Amino acid sequence: MINAVQGHRTNSVQEAINYLKGDHDHKGVERNPKPRFFTGSENDCLIACESIDRKQKYVTGTLAFGPNERPRDKELMEVVKSFRATFMAGLEHGVNFTDFWNIHEDKNRIELNYVIPLTELTTGRQINPFPPGKAKEYFKAAF
């Protein structure tokens, strides 16, 4: 499994989520099978990002599995829980942070895509699951 972090984003989180939910990839090729929702909350991500005054509002990424790795949804949920525990350590999902996850299977592999608003929900302070420099690589290696 590869954790490909696309980075911190400044454009509309709705555009990012629409792309992940969309029937076509970035080249305009129809996705078959269609993307499917997995966990988290699109609406909560939209609300959280609208409350952020900072330039960078959210981060996106993909957990890409190899062609021979076919985890079932129950196993994928364990991956999400482990991801949250690693990159959002000490924070409770739904209380301190929110996210959105969906699945793409159109490239002969499972891709578990995520969007995470960069704000702690109870304080409005910035959070950064992928800090710059060596810390980011340390977290990715730990996961």
Annotate each PLM feature.
Residues M1-F143:
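N-terminal nicking endonuclease/strand-transfer module with a His-rich metal-binding environment
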